[in-house]
Amino acid sequence: MLTETTITKLREMRLSVMANALKDQMADPQFQNMAFEDRLGLLVDAEWNARKNNHLQKLIRQATFSEPGACLENVEYIPDRNLKREDLLRFGTCGYIQEHHNILLLGATGSGKTYLACALGMAAVRQFLTVRYIRLPDLLVDFNIARGNGSIRKLLAQYKKYSLLIIDEWLLYPFEYAGREQTV
């Protein structure tokens, strides 16, 4: 009876993962002989892991990656791509973000620039940094709409909040073609 009340209270406190873990512990006889601190630790770990995972998934969704499955570990180091493993591993630590440096990826169409940019973005997200991926034409459309309805400052403030802003298709098209009509 006391366990059901505790589980109900945990759910009311929005600790549903902990409540489910407690229910599982009560049903599994191997937990009965564990020390209280050990069982409590397992319950807290379950809740903490679920919350961290949910936060990570939210950051991935908010980043709007074109390739959300991209990761630096899967980059192919083909000789004609001139990629250096040590450079990418260093970029994967996201030190350039804390130092407020930029990375510009250059290469022919189809050489993997978008994948690499998304992989760098995923490395940042895995460190719980806020990331936003956007194509330059879409960014320019956003700016033109904001300029038209007077919300340009709000849009700029929104983009300033990200730890990493990935602008894909940078200058792939002339600015006029991409929808740019005035200076930002």
Predicted regions and their residues:
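Phosphate-binding P-loop
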Residues: 92-100
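Walker A/P-loop
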Residues: 104-131
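Charged, compositionally biased N-terminal leader segments and the immediate start
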Residues: 1-20
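Conserved nucleotide-sensing/catalytic segment adjacent to the nucleotide-binding pocket
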Residues: 150-184
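Dynamic helix-loop-helix/coil hinge segments at AAA+ ATPase domain boundaries and subdomain interfaces
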Residues: 7-9, 61-84
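Interdomain "pre-motor" coupling segment immediately N-terminal to P-loop NTPase/helicase cores
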Residues: 16-68
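Short glycine-rich substrate-engagement loop in P-loop NTPases that contacts/grips substrate
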Residues: 81-89, 131-160
